Amino acid sequence: MAKYISQVNVSLDKADEQQFANQGFTKINVDLNKGIGGKCVYIWFKHGSVAITKLQVTFNDEMAVGLINAGYTKIDKNLNAGADGDFIYLWYFRGSGEYNTPIEAIDVTTDADGEALKFKNGWERLACDLNRGAAGSWIHAWVKREKKTYICDVTATVSYETDSDHYKKGFIRLDEDTNRGAGGYFVFIWYRQTPDSQRALSELNVSTNDREYQSLEQQKYTPVCANLNEGTGGNRVNLWYKKDHVKHPVTAITLLIGAANIKAYKVTGVPVIEKNLNTGNGGSIENVCFYQWQA
């Protein structure tokens, strides 16, 4: 029996739903427009022998260029159809090699409590709210891979120029701007996964001022050079990592927006780095969250 997610699609109306059902797709019964009206939008999937290995989301045209150049396929149906939010599109890729572990399950959540439990249980969260800009429920897609993977590299970009290179090297973009609501550049965190736990990162951290920067340097963390606050006039903000003594390897990373979401993750014991990526500007409260495998 085929175990991989091999096809993904999106329905915007009853005709789409009937077509996908007839083709053997399975519907994820969560309306992606929940809480805002608009069309009833659903994600569908199908199992097969040729695996999808990457899913990404775009909320502007510039985000799409690197995906196109790297060979990703766009599902050309707006996940915010009929609502007033951003134009949100889902993209997928079928790859091979160390950085392309097959996806075997896909799901959707509508609240932070459900998210936190999934995050602890080996699911990988797509960072972009599928209701982005529409003020409805917090909707996130999730994937689970056929075997455990570990975060082995992190980086960040302050322009779209190197996107295709990052995708071709196996990186996954956290599809939410670390400058959300603050103006400035579109800044994104990227990560790369491997099944090899010995190559994993062991710690992540964030600095939001000179004192924190110096402290993390003294603790032998390595900085990601890009300023996550680039162009906003706020504090310089950097992501940091360690890659030694991998007793509890990092298996997942995501971005959380808003105090309520942060609280839900903390209650379930998921580490949240309590340093706002928008420190010093008027943007959204954003925090990096990660999980370490407890063997």
Please give the residue ranges for each predicted region.
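Terminus-proximal functional modules
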Residues: 1-295
